[in-house]
């Protein structure tokens, strides 16, 4: 679920904290990805046929998560991004009540799905299918194996994946956390990226002009959130608990706006409870806000010394066996994936170097042009001054003026030459970028039947092999 209404409240109250970015803005960046959330999105988005069933192998086992994960990971790498996938561990005890509620919702959705199938209601089938999707323990293990064979770093969190992702940004081992769960901000991630997998498949019904905007992501900056809301991190955590989180109930009658006003006035939940009208606002009998607060401040995560991040060479033959023999993927398709994977690994490194040197070259050229222009103006000024102050030496002044004009002409030629050179570099860079972009575009059959993404966030329970959630419509050199 994340934090109820948090993203909208931030957008309304601290708009400078949220901005749209293109995936190109993450070129060369290490991004920690909430793997469980990604798998759910792939399973719900990649469907086969009108009945919205998952892609399956010959044994009837779902392969949508494998297809989606492989395709999206390669796509991210082709755009210069360096992904780290973080998997959930055991859910915290405080989350037990929330998991029970999710189980009840899933059971209700399964009943509605059966009814919709009996009636042939395709729209309802599509809606309820998404609500009954589960990411099993086996699917998680298959995803880990796939990523390992591809040479992509995999981290297994002792508890919540988004908490581990957040701490990777604190350790400066990652630039951002990619998840739809806004509670990553409460765990302290410096940057939250949403919609990283929103375009995991092409939707036949999406706006035809949307592709012109590029691959748009949402970036939320925690520092700007706190600055915009004028809250300390401790106050922000208490505010989010009052809004509604996975770890405890909240005070009835208090939404995000009221919670914010109360935190601004009283600073913490303890003071709020002491001062509010409890006839108007019902405080839960067993309000575990202290435990929830500690879960956000000191979550169960791997320490920096325990985290190992290695981008390894892909194990090509093992990868082929896993995809073709074990999961019945088309051999031609797999060969294409592997070719793109190997190329993307080179592109990721090369593009980072190209970006560095191109940036330096452009900057240096610009500075040289500016300095040359200043020299021209300086020369002009000196020439005029000599003419005014040296009337007694007319012939000498005339000679100097002639020299100045000659120098000015020479400097102007130098400026023009540098400008032309700069323009040529810029054009070349733009052409190279377009070539890279064109090479990244691909159309996969498995991605043609995507489900609509809904605006509600819920997390996975790995230990029970179960989740229920809806996907939102809408988000140093390592280099972090």
From Swiss-Prot:
One of its GO terms (biological process) is DNA replication, removal of RNA primer. It is an enzyme of class 3 (hydrolase). GO terms for molecular function: 5'-3' exonuclease activity; 5'-flap endonuclease activity; DNA binding; magnesium ion binding. DNA binds at residues 47, 72, 160, 244, 246. It is found in: Nucleus, Nucleolus; Nucleus, Nucleoplasm; Mitochondrion. Residues 349-357 are annotated as: Interaction with PCNA. Residues 1-106 are annotated as: N-domain. This is Flap endonuclease 1. The gene is FEN1.
